[in-house]
Amino acid sequence: DSEGVRYEEPKLKMMGIEAVKSSTPAPCRTMIKDGLKIMMNGTEEEVIDYIDNCRTKFKALPPEEIAFPRTVSNVKKYHSRTDIYSKGTPIHARGALLFNYYIKKNKLDKKYSLISNGEKIKFIYLKKPNIIQENVVSFIQDFPRELNLDKYIDYDLQFEKSFLEPLKAILDAIGWNVEKTVNLELFFT
């Protein structure tokens, strides 16, 4: 029921969780919502299988779809004269400053606009070591493949932060695991 109106299929009202936050990548929002439905109607085993399937699908998605959307402000404030960014720079702003630096350095500023204050951007985690020796890069709409960073995208960390952590908070509360666990009892049964 919703204020006296009965729905064919019960509607789940979600507030404050990653399934509805605009700062969560869109495919993850859908996967989290579906995961919550399985949690309410299925078994722990079904949830674990669902998470494994989501991990496989996630790793096949392009960077533009799995990156975290944010609005960046104070890009100039965090710029450093000696380094690319100053200490304490938020991760998405650090990614923006790195993007601007490497786009200029590689003379790609005709193809990609530089990121400025108030811009809607996306940021993605990178594995280290990599060619820029940083763990993040931001971009506006299209991932800059010319920087050759595609092979360094940390799909595992992206999946962990955008999908697994939000689900794990709920699974922990109900005492379920996110993956199959082996315990000693299995050896004695």
PLM region spans:
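DNA-dependent DNA polymerase catalytic subunits
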Residues: 1-189
